[in-house]
Amino acid sequence: MMDLFKNRKRTIYDRTGKIPYLVRWYIFLKDRKSFPFNVTLHKILVSDEPVLHDHPWSWGTMILKGGYWEHTPLRAEEGHVVGSTKKWWGPGTVRFRKADDLHWLELAKDKDGNEIPCWSLFYMGKKAKDWGFMQQVKDIGYRWIHNEKYLKDRKVDERT
C-alpha cells in the first residue's frame, strides 16, 4: 500500500537538519496552495526537542500506533508560561488543537531506551499565522520567538 503513496512522501529532518524526525505521506493533496485543509499520514521517528512550539494552522490527529507524551504549557495564575506539564496519548486518541496551542512531543521508549515511532492520521487546516517557539529568557520568563529567528539563533549556538 505504501507504494501507492511513494511520490507523496516527504521526510522532515530535526532542527539540525541531520536526523530524520518525521515521515509524512500526503493522503489528500501533496501540493496545496489555497485549499483549506490537508490530510496526511505521519510516522514520528524521534521526539521533538524539549521546547514548546505552536503551528501555522489548526490541526487534528488520530493516533494509530504507538503514542507520545504531549508537553503543554504550565501557566501561572496571571496566565504567563512558567514551564510545562505532560499527558500520555496512545492508540485511538483523537484530538484537535488551535494554531496558537503550544506543545512538544516526547515518544515512548523501549526497554533499551530507543524511541518507539508513533503513527498518526493528521489533519492540518488553512494557514492562520507564522509559527514559533517559546524561549526562556533570563529574568523575563518565556517569550514567543518566530521559527526562523529561533532556528537561526540555534545554529549559531551549535557552532560555539
Please name every model-derived segment.
Residues K33-F37, W59, H71-P73, W89-G90:
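Beta-sandwich/jelly-roll carbohydrate-recognition scaffolds of carbohydrate-active enzymes
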Residues T72-L105:
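Short acidic-glycine-tyrosine-enriched beta hairpin
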Residues D112-W131:
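A short hydrophobic beta-strand segment most commonly corresponding to one strand
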Residues V39-H55, A99:
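Conserved short histidine dyad/triad with adjacent acidic residue
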Residues E49, R95, D100-K111, K129:
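Histidine-centered metal-chelating micro-motifs
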Residues M1-N38, V81:
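A short, N-terminal "cap"/entry segment at the start of jelly-roll beta-barrel domains
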Residues Q136, Y142-K152, E158:
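Mixed-charge, glycine-accented linear interaction segment located at domain edges/termini
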Residues H55-E70:
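Short, conserved beta-strand element in jelly-roll/cupin
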